[in-house]
């Protein structure tokens, strides 16, 4: 049975690339969520004025992988204690967030944060909010990391996260 989950963990290139390599994930799509502008562009989102977060919509087979496991992956590929930035990417569009589609996802997200908080010195600032309209990002953003491995940002930031996730989640890597 196909379900959806939406996560924001900084630049969507790495988040999308990791989820697309997980068994049970049918598709991960980079996009924008929970802003005030309809059909925002990347350029508009980068100004920070639209209110959107760079996010990834994950379509997954719940008989193969659970939402809880997706939460584990999400929290392992970004720093949930950084408010409105991930590393050198700064702005509200790079915030950490879980955008739930039903009450169960909200409860599981809040439970996971409560479980993880004792393992962090800083407060987890991941927002847990109802999903508003998800707008897919422009085509050139889809699959960006794997299509542009020589990009300097990818080499310095995204690829190391991707490779770390590949090792950590080897048993469920495609």
UniProtKB/Swiss-Prot annotation:
GO terms for biological process: protein modification process. It catalyses: L-methionyl-[protein] + [thioredoxin]-disulfide + H2O = L-methionyl-(S)-S-oxide-[protein] + [thioredoxin]-dithiol; [thioredoxin]-disulfide + L-methionine + H2O = L-methionine (S)-S-oxide + [thioredoxin]-dithiol. Transmembrane segments: none annotated. Signal peptide: none annotated. It is an enzyme of class 1 (oxidoreductase). The active site is at 11. InterPro entries: Met_Sox_Rdtase_MsrA_dom (IPR002569), Met_Sox_Rdtase_MsrA_sf (IPR036509). Pfam families: PMSR (PF01625). Its EC number is 1.8.4.11. Keywords: Oxidoreductase. GO terms for molecular function: L-methionine:thioredoxin-disulfide S-oxidoreductase activity; peptide-methionine (S)-S-oxide reductase activity. HAMAP family: MsrA (MF_01401). Belongs to the MsrA Met sulfoxide reductase family. Has an important function as a repair enzyme for proteins that have been inactivated by oxidation. Catalyzes the reversible oxidation-reduction of methionine sulfoxide in proteins to methionine. This is Peptide methionine sulfoxide reductase MsrA. It comes from Pasteurella multocida (strain Pm70). The gene is msrA.
């Amino acid at each position: 049975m196909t379900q959806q989950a939406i996560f924001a963990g900084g630049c969507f290139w790495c988040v999308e690339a990791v989820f697309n390599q997980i068994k049970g994930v049918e598709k991960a799509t980079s996009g924008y969520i929970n802003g005030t502008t309809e059909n925002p562009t990347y350029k508009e989102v980068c100004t920070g004025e639209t209110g959107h977060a760079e996010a990834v919509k994950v379509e997954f087979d719940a008989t193969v992988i659970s939402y809880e496991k997706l939460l584990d992956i999400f929290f392992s590929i970004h720093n949930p204690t950084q408010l409105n930035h991930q590393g050198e990417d700064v702005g509200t569009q790079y915030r950490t967030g879980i955008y739930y589609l039903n009450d169960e996802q909200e409860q599981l997200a809040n439970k996971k944060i409560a479980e993880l908080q004792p393992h962090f010195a800083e407060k987890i600032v991941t927002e847990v909010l109802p999903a508003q309209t998800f707008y897919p990002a422009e085509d050139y953003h889809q699959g960006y990391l794997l299509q542009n491995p020589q990009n300097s940002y990818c080499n310095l930031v995204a690829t190391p996260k991707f490779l770390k996730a590949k090792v950590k989640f080897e048993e469920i890597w495609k």
